[in-house]
Design a protein with these regions (language model features):
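A polyanion-binding, active-site-adjacent surface
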Residues: 1-177, 181-229
Length: 233
């Protein structure tokens, strides 16, 4: 637990990427009209949840007026509305909503992280920004020692989780799994990797991701966690 606390402290003080620093601080200063009475977080957003979790949910990056405003991943935006509703439905959260850091939300046997910790312009981090954030992702993966199931939200998170594992010296399967919604693969180190479309407005408004599809992902995660842990044998 102390490892994650120290990691998250370092994350919140990171200034490695000048483009992201400028953007996150500009958004925090200018604000969106509906949030003009908020004091925006305007810094990198750390991971959040149960340090002893068996489920790890990995997203892309904080939203400019979501996590960059509230200081908590997936909090205060429509993507979070979908995610926390699903987590609550399957027993991974104590409530279905996430509005601000002090709203009483607790994750149960679940931890949420991101491939990039600062809100990027147009929701598109640059390749060098992914690389700059990779050490944080690797350290988060190392620190979450009880993880059995990983749900990646979107192709980018799926691919970068595998890259981080490779960088950690873990032997990736061959052929390498390719992202698709609902893909389930047991990796050589006995972690179950599940791919899901990201619950972004673009995906949910167009129907690419529906509520039943989202719920099925976390029903699968819950089912996998109910199975015996082969690593204990």
């Amino acid at each position: 637990m102390r490892e994650l606390t120290l990691l998250n402290d370092r994350i919140t003080h990171c200034t490695a990427c000048s483009r992201l620093v400028t953007y996150r601080e500009t958004v925090a200063a200018e604000k969106r009209k509906q949030f003009e009475d908020w004091t925006y977080w305007g810094r990198p957003v750390p991971g959040f949840g149960d340090p002893h979790a068996r489920l790890y949910v990995l997203g892309l990056a904080p939203a400019a007026h979501g996590g960059n405003r509230t200081g908590r991943v997936f909090t205060g935006d429509r993507s979070g509305d979908w995610l926390f509703d699903a987590l609550h439905r399957f027993g991974f959260a104590n409530q279905p909503n996430s509005y601000h850091r002090d709203d009483g939300l607790k994750l149960l046997d679940c931890y949420i992280g991101a491939t990039v910790r600062c809100a990027p312009p147009d929701n598109k981090p640059a390749p060098e920004e992914f690389m700059a954030c990779r050490p944080y992702l690797r350290e988060e993966i190392r620190s979450l020692r009880k993880i059995l199931v990983v749900v990646t939200l979107g192709k980018i998170a799926f691919d970068h989780y595998l890259k981080a594992c490779r960088d950690e010296g873990l032997k990736l399967p061959s052929p390498l799994p390719k992202f698709s919604h609902g893909i389930v693969r047991v990796l050589p180190w006995d972690i179950t990797l599940i791919g899901s479309y990201h619950p972004s407005q673009q995906n949910t408004f167009t129907g690419l991701l529906t509520r039943p599809m989202c719920h099925h992902i976390f029903a699968t995660a819950r089912q996998r966690l109910a199975e015996p842990d082969r690593r204990s044998k």
